[in-house]
A protein has these predicted regions:
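Post-transcriptional modification and biogenesis factors for structured RNAs
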Residues: 1-138
Length: 138
């Protein structure tokens, strides 16, 4: 079922962080990973952090030139953001985010979870494609 969830990393800066995402994804059900305009994508640098289970996900990564293309086959998208208010969409808790996404996956529909660059997060033009936002307490 988690193969219907698309983890989208927008403009990631460090391959090592992509490897960490692959490891986490493998530990929680192996959702595929898409990259949008990565600053640097080198599987050799990502692999040590992905571990054996995440390596398969790294080998299957798809790279896109826009968020729109990365999520084109998804019917629901949640963006991550540390900022709330302003022109932002409805914000849900991580627990509510999981429930919302599971509703789509259980119906056999694709959903996406957007994460922004490590140093600044998603910008408004990235979030335009999100139906809702989730703020993850850090």
């Amino acid at each position: 079922m988690f193969d219907l969830l698309n983890i989208v990393l927008v403009e990631p800066r460090f391959p090592e962080n992509i490897g960490s995402v692959a490891r986490a994804s493998a530990n929680f059900g192996s959702a595929p990973i898409s990259l949008v305009k990565p600053e640097m994508w080198e599987i050799e640098k990502a692999s040590p952090l992905a571990t054996k289970q995440g390596l398969r996900l790294l080998e299957q990564i798809r790279v896109f030139d826009s968020v729109e293309k990365a999520i084109q086959d998804c019917v629901f998208c949640i963006g991550t953001s540390a900022r709330v208010g302003g022109v932002r969409r409805e914000t849900v808790s991580p627990k509510e985010c999981a429930k919302e996404i599971m509703r789509y996956l259980e119906q056999g529909e694709r959903a996406a979870l957007l994460f922004g660059p490590e140093d600044r997060g998603l910008e408004n033009h990235h979030l335009e494609h999100s139906h809702k936002l989730v703020t993850i307490p850090a």
